[in-house]
Swiss-Prot record:
Belongs to the QueA family. GO terms for molecular function: S-adenosylmethionine:tRNA ribosyltransferase-isomerase activity. InterPro entries: QueA (IPR003699), QueA_dom1 (IPR042118), QueA_dom2 (IPR042119), QueA_sf (IPR036100). Its EC number is 2.4.99.17. The lineage of its organism: Bacteria, Pseudomonadati, Pseudomonadota, Gammaproteobacteria, Lysobacterales. GO terms for biological process: queuosine biosynthetic process; tRNA wobble guanine modification. The gene is queA. GO terms for cellular component: cytoplasm. Coiled coil: none annotated. It comes from Stenotrophomonas maltophilia (strain R551-3). This is S-adenosylmethionine:tRNA ribosyltransferase-isomerase.
Length: 343
């Protein structure tokens, strides 16, 4: 299977550059199995589409202000994007500079303090930070929010709230689980009143989520690593839901990635650790019965994943419908409620 099989043409003006005033006012494209028709709705219509006893699974990761700037001893400018906090004031990061920094070199940070290069970890660097408080706390005021590269503006104060889900609590992501951005307190209350249950996993979305697939043949693609935690409580919630005839709905590709990484011989089990799972058509997703997901970039691994779930032809039909109806795409864009292909 080729990367180019997942390309499509998107007018640039459909790439959302800012969130709507209300989270749940985003549009929602209902995509049932073929041949049923698509339906244009809003995210706040979700309670009418779900049933009592259904389980919505959210990703509770919290985005850190992970972008930093500084300079090397030579005076060369450096941009740092933290990929993961490692503990002990260390982090794994992408480092952008005119020349690759060497182990032992130090970067003077614009926000104060220094980052010492300890060595390489694949395409990343391991950095030791010398800052006056815990790295996590220091980043809250010293770091910049790492908005995706297709958002063509500098992050503002509103982004600190809006590029974060209302249920974010586990610090560690460098990108938001964007399907969750549509859920506000009124919508969550309406879903609860409907009898819909909520569960959470944690998957810390890494900088690799923005990296393009470079291999033409998908079997040659090396998937990026991300850390996740699927807890015992969530596993029990899923089992109870299924036993009672309810549906499990994953809110976002990160939730599905976490759940599928925790599947063992067709059974969901507690799991904490790294995953490199790469889901493409031909893979059968068993952990969820439906997905809420945003519209994804051409040739992206996320587009490949939802094509595995709902069928590539069906997904591309939905995307063409969304383009024709002027839906908003990508992180701050609209969403779809996606059901699996029949059979």
């Amino acid at each position: 299977m080729k990367k180019s099989d997942f390309n499509y043409n998107l007018p640039a003006e459909l790439i959302a550059q800012a969130p709507l005033a209300e989270r749940s006012a985003s549009r929602l494209l209902l995509v049932p199995p073929a041949p049923d028709a698509f339906t244009d709705l809003q995210v706040r219509d979700l309670p009418s589409l779900l049933q009592p006893g259904d389980l919505l699974v959210f990703n509770d990761t919290r985005v850190i202000p992970a972008r930093l700037f500084g300079q090397k001893a030579s005076g060369g400018r450096v941009e740092i994007l933290i990929e993961r906090l490692l503990g002990g004031q260390q982090a794994r990061a992408q480092v952008g500079a005119s020349k690759s920094p060497k182990a032992g070199s130090r970067i003077a940070l614009d926000a104060g303090g220094e980052a010492e290069v300890l060595g390489r970890d694949g395409e990343f660097y391991v950095l030791q930070f010398h800052v006056p408080e815990s790295l996590e706390q220091w980043l809250l005021h010293a770091g910049r929010l790492p908005l995706p590269p297709y958002i063509q503006r500098e992050p503002g104060m509103d982004d600190r709230e809006r590029y974060q889900t209302v249920f974010a609590r586990e610090v560690g992501a460098v990108a938001a689980p964007t399907a969750g951005l549509h859920f506000d307190e009124p919508l969550l209350a309406a879903l609860k009143d409907k009898g819909v249950d909520f569960g959470h996993v944690t998957l810390h979305v890494g900088a690799g989520t923005f990296q393009p697939v470079r291999a033409d043949d998908l079997k040659d693609h090396v998937m990026h690593r991300e850390w996740l935690n699927v807890g015992a409580e969530l596993v029990q919630q899923v089992r109870r839901t299924r036993a009672a005839g309810g549906r499990v709905i994953g809110v976002g590709t990160t939730v599905v990635r976490a759940l599928e990484s925790a599947m063992r011989d067709g059974e969901l089990l507690p799991f904490a650790g790294e995953t490199q799972i790469f889901i493409t058509p031909g893979y059968r997703i068993r952990s969820v019965d439906a997905m809420v997901t945003n519209f994804h970039l051409p040739e992206s691994t996320l587009l490949m994943m939802i094509s595995a779930f709902a069928g590539k032809e069906r997904v591309f039909e939905a995307y063409q419908h969304a383009i024709a109806q002027r839906y908003r795409f990508f992180s701050y864009g609209d969403a779809m409620l996606l059901f699996p292909q029949a059979g």
